[in-house]
Amino acid sequence: MEKFKAVLDLQRKHRNALGYSLVTLLTAGGEKIFSSVVFQCPCTATWNLPYGLVFLLVPALALFLLGYALSARTWRLLTGCCSRSARFSSGLRSAFVCAQLSMTAAFAPLTWVAVALLEGSFYQCAVSGSARLAPYLCKGRDPNCNATLPQAPCNKQKVEMQEILSQLKAQSQVFGWILIAAVIILLLLVKSVTRCFSPVSYLQLKFWEIYWEKEKQILQNQAAENATQLAEENVRCFFECSKPKECNTPSSKDWQEISALYTFNPKNQFYSMLHKYVSREEMSGSVRSVEGDAVIPALGFVDDMSMTNTHEL
């Protein structure tokens, strides 16, 4: 049991690194399956370029959209935004949150493109069908090279085609490593700038993360317990044809208040929207944004809180 707790603690401490590692492994594995099982270059001047680009970019686009769909912040931002009764966040704040979501969602597609470029098959197929690059690839080669170039991915036995494919694979791998280096540098820069502009110290940020984990866990347990009690009372009253007991549950407005995007204010340092809500008496009964509220990138994890719809009873 102690070992299991140690594993859980390790997972909590390094959840971001473990998450990115898992995404990288799954993306690399998916690309390997696509390139070896599904991908078959048509080897025609008409289809090589679009076929190669589709396999290189469309899965990346799908992973990008999936990254949005799997983010709790996305649904926190979108849920109820078209309702007349919903309170709209400022356009600048929403745009800033969308930019953060885009950067997070872009990790998997960039991984796909980088792995695909290192493997080289998609790039070889696409470039061999490009009429603009044909003169460059066929420079100093057989006069019929331009016409036979689209067939290069299917004629790997020919020496001339092997040379062209080797050249294309080398180019693809160079671009792949450049992309990987650029992504790593960008991640380090963003992380450094985010921490540099953090309004709280390193230790307070760690305390904040501990609080966030505990609040998320307790909210999940308490919500499941209250939902179970309410369901049991309603079912009991249905079968007994009796009136239900009074059950105090948060109103729709209450849920909207704690579901809003978190904003930081140095005058009132609340650790979550739930914390801000229960302290609302100090703020004239409202948790709406006030002057000084700001979206802080280093505190973006606060908006990742969500409740699952399954619970062991």
Curated annotation (Swiss-Prot):
Residues 38-46, 127-167 are extracellular. This is Calcium homeostasis modulator protein 6. The keyword Metal-binding does not apply. Pore-forming subunit of an ATP-permeable channel. In response to pathogen-derived and proinflammatory stimuli, relocates from intracellular compartments to NK-dendritic cell and NK-macrophage immune synapses where it mediates ATP efflux and NK cell activation involved in antimicrobial and antitumor responses. May assemble to form gap junction channel-like structures with gating and ion conductance likely regulated by membrane lipids and voltage rather than by extracellular calcium levels. Immune cells in primary and secondary lymphoid organs. The chain crosses the membrane at residues 22-37, 47-68, 102-126, 168-190. Induction: Up-regulated in macrophages and dendritic cells upon stimulation with type I IFN, Poly(I:C) and LPS. Down-regulated by anti-inflammatory stimuli. The gene is Calhm6. It is found in: Cell membrane. One of its GO terms (cellular component) is immunological synapse. Keywords: Cell membrane, Disulfide bond, Immunity, Inflammatory response, Innate immunity, Ion channel, Ion transport, Membrane, Transmembrane, Transmembrane helix, Transport. Residues 1-21, 69-101, 191-313 are cytoplasmic. It comes from Mus musculus (Mouse). The keyword Iron-sulfur does not apply. Disulfide bonds join 41-125, 43-154, 138-145. N-glycosylated. One of its GO terms (molecular function) is voltage-gated channel activity. It comes from the Eukaryota. Inhibited by Gd(3+). Partially inhibited by divalent ions Ca(2+) and Ba(2+). GO terms for biological process: ATP export; inflammatory response; innate immune response; monoatomic ion transmembrane transport; regulation of natural killer cell cytokine production. It catalyses: ATP(in) = ATP(out).
